[in-house]
Structure formats: structure tokens, C-alpha cells
């Protein structure tokens, strides 16, 4: 945007890049923690859960910008 924030939809697109290629998304939930700016580095942290994955995009100190949960049916 005009303030150089990362668009909320872009977080989800970035997180989806870390899912296995054959993973079919049935449900998605994003929890936004803080804003990232244009030149911020987003470090992915991926955890396998019972019915899918949680992808957390974090800053260099490990603080989350967003956690996105992707579930299969």
C-alpha cells in the first residue's frame, strides 16, 4: 500500500509456497500479529499438525507477523 505495508493477502500467498505440492486446502485461517513492511525479511516456520500445516512468517528475532493454518478435509 502507500505506507509500504505488506498486503494481508500476500502473507497467505507467501505461506502457501511452503505447503507440499499435493496438499489440497479445505480450510484456511490467518492470525495477523504485526505489520511487515516492504523490505522486511519474512522467515517461514512450518509445523505439521493433525490435519494440515501451520505456517508462521516471522521476523529476524522470531516474532510472528502472521500464522496461517491450512487444513485438509
Predicted regions and their residues:
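A conserved acidic, glycine/proline-rich C-terminal tail/linker
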Residues: 21-54
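Residue-identity detector for glutamine
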Residues: 10, 27, 35, 72-73
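Surface-exposed beta-strand edges and their flanking turn/coil or helix-capping segments
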Residues: 5-9, 43-45, 70
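Hot-dog-fold acyl-thioester-processing enzymes
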Residues: 1-24
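HotDog/MaoC-like acyl-thioester-processing domains
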Residues: 37-38, 47-73
Amino acid at each position: 500500500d502507500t505506507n509500504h505495508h505488506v498486503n494481508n493477502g500476500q502473507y497467505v500467498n507467501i505461506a502457501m509456497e511452503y505447503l507440499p505440492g499435493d496438499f489440497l486446502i479445505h480450510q484456511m485461517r490467518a492470525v495477523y500479529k504485526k505489520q511487515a513492511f516492504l523490505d522486511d525479511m519474512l522467515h517461514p516456520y512450518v509445523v505439521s499438525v493433525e490435519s494440515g500445516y501451520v505456517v508462521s512468517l516471522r521476523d529476524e528475532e522470531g516474532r510472528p507477523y502472521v500464522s496461517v493454518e491450512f487444513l485438509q478435509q
